[in-house]
């Protein structure tokens, strides 16, 4: 099985640092990074922030390692690190993830 792991970070620099670490450790085949505007509840009030979202492409069994690695590097006390199962996909793409992630 395969996952997209959705992660948010407060800056492009932090997102890139996390992405590079996951790739260097072969925990991800690819990481997409894009800017987002987030609205959320925090400490009893609605907040808004510019953040950077990451989509990590990996194997399902790597979730715990990715989560632990990201949590150790992340500046947020409660970072968004959520796995989204890939139910179907192009076989060659999924094979590439399998071949790339160790």
UniProtKB/Swiss-Prot annotation:
**Per its database record, what is this protein's job?**
Involved in resistance toward heavy metals.
The record, for PANTHER family, names: DIVALENT CATION TOLERANCE CUTA-RELATED, FI09726P
What domain of life does the UniProt record list for this protein's source?
Archaea
Per the record, the GO terms for biological process are: response to metal ion
| A Pfam entry, by short name | CutA1
Which NCBIfam families does this one have? Answer: dival_cat_tol_CutA
Which organism does this record belong to?
Answer: Archaeoglobus fulgidus (strain ATCC 49558 / DSM 4304 / JCM 9628 / NBRC 100126 / VC-16)
Protein name, UniProt field: Divalent-cation tolerance protein CutA
Q: Which GO molecular function annotations are given, in alphabetical order?
A: copper ion binding
Protein family: Belongs to the CutA family.
